[in-house]
Structure formats: structure tokens, C-alpha cells
């Protein structure tokens, strides 16, 4: 048996294993980065839609904040010359099969061509907190006292991107929150 040939095969095998490990690590990190960017894009799309809707609260005659709670807000606003209702709410009992942490966030109201539309988004959390002051320090549950509204949204990837140290799946996540002070609600 040739010792040089055996050593060459051993070194070649180790080199091949190290290249495969490197390739695996690059692919895993690429997947994590892509998942993270997708979640950030989803949050950005939700941010734009929610921001556009929140600016309309109290806009027009008979426009009003109809009701709200921790995970729901419904209001009427004047859109293209008509009073229309818009609501954002978590759908109870809904879940996404690939990620048990996600529930369905539903937006109902006019969209694009003025027809009512129902848009659904998988989210981890959607929270509405109303305040009776513009600074967002005094919470209120009375819709007539609302002067500012804090909206918080958290999303996660549909598929796990790895495992936590305890063995549970790890999902890419991104969140956003903003305090809205609708001009038509400030007196």
C-alpha cells in the first residue's frame, strides 16, 4: 500500500468535507438573510397601509372612531366623496399551519378601485392602544376621549429558519410601532 496515496486521499477527503461545511453554512445564512428581508418587506407594506388608513380617522362629516380594543379598530372616514368603514382586526381562532405563532390580521374596507376588499396578513401580534392625550401617556377606553392611537405589529416568517438552543423552531421576525395623532381628533 502506498502511504503517499493514502495521505492524499485523507487530505482530499478532509478538504472536501470542509468545502461542503462551508457551502452548507453559506446556504443557511443566505436563507436566514432572505427570510429576514421578506419579513421586513411585509412589515413595511403593512406600515404603509396602516399609516394611510390611520390618517383618515375622523376625516369628513359623520366620520368617527366606531370602536376599538386591544386587537381591533374600526372607524368611518370620507373616502372619494363617500363615508366608508375601515376595520383592522385579528381573526379569532385563525392560525397559519406552518407557524403556530401566527394569526390572521384582516383589513376590511375600500381598496384601490373603491370596492370593499378583505385583505389578510399573517402576523404574530397586532395591538391597538388608545390615549386621551397627544403624547401617548394616558390610556383610555372611551372612544370620545381618544386623541392618539398606538399601533404595534409583529410578523414572523412562515417557515422556521433554524432552531433555538432549547430545540424549538426559530422564526425570522420583524416589528413596527407608531403613535398616530389624527389631525381630525385633536381639539
Where are these regions (language model features)?
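Aliphatic-rich helix starts adjacent to a transmembrane/signal segment
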Residues: 2-56
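Hydrophobic, well-ordered secondary-structure segments
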Residues: 5, 21-26, 36-37, 61, ...
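Short, glycine/small-hydrophobic-rich surface segments
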Residues: 31-32, 38, 54-79
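An alpha-helix initiation/capping motif
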Residues: 44, 68-69, 145
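Type IV pilin-like appendage domain
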Residues: 67-138, 170-175
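Short linear sequence signals and composition-biased patches located at protein termini or domain-edge surfaces
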Residues: 125-187
Amino acid at each position: 500500500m502506498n502511504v503517499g496515496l493514502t495521505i492524499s486521499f485523507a487530505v482530499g477527503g478532509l478538504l472536501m468535507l470542509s468545502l461542503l461545511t462551508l457551502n452548507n453554512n453559506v446556504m443557511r445564512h443566505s436563507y436566514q438573510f432572505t427570510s429576514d428581508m421578506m419579513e421586513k418587506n411585509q412589515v413595511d407594506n403593512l406600515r404603509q397601509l396602516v399609516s394611510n388608513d390611520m390618517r383618515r380617522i375622523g376625516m369628513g362629516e359623520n366620520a368617527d372612531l366606531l370602536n376599538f380594543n386591544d386587537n381591533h379598530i374600526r372607524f368611518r372616514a370620507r373616502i372619494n366623496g363617500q363615508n366608508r368603514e375601515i376595520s383592522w382586526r385579528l381573526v379569532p381562532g385563525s392560525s397559519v399551519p406552518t407557524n403556530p405563532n401566527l394569526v390572521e390580521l384582516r383589513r376590511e374596507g375600500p381598496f384601490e378601485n373603491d370596492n370593499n376588499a378583505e385583505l389578510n396578513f399573517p402576523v404574530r401580534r397586532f395591538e391597538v392602544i388608545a390615549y386621551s392625550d397627544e403624547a401617548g401617556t394616558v390610556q383610555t377606553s372611551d372612544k370620545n376621549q381618544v386623541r392618539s392611537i398606538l399601533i404595534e405589529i409583529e410578523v414572523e416568517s412562515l417557515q422556521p429558519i433554524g432552531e433555538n438552543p432549547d430545540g424549538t423552531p426559530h422564526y425570522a421576525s420583524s416589528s413596527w410601532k407608531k403613535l398616530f395623532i389624527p389631525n381630525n381628533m385633536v381639539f
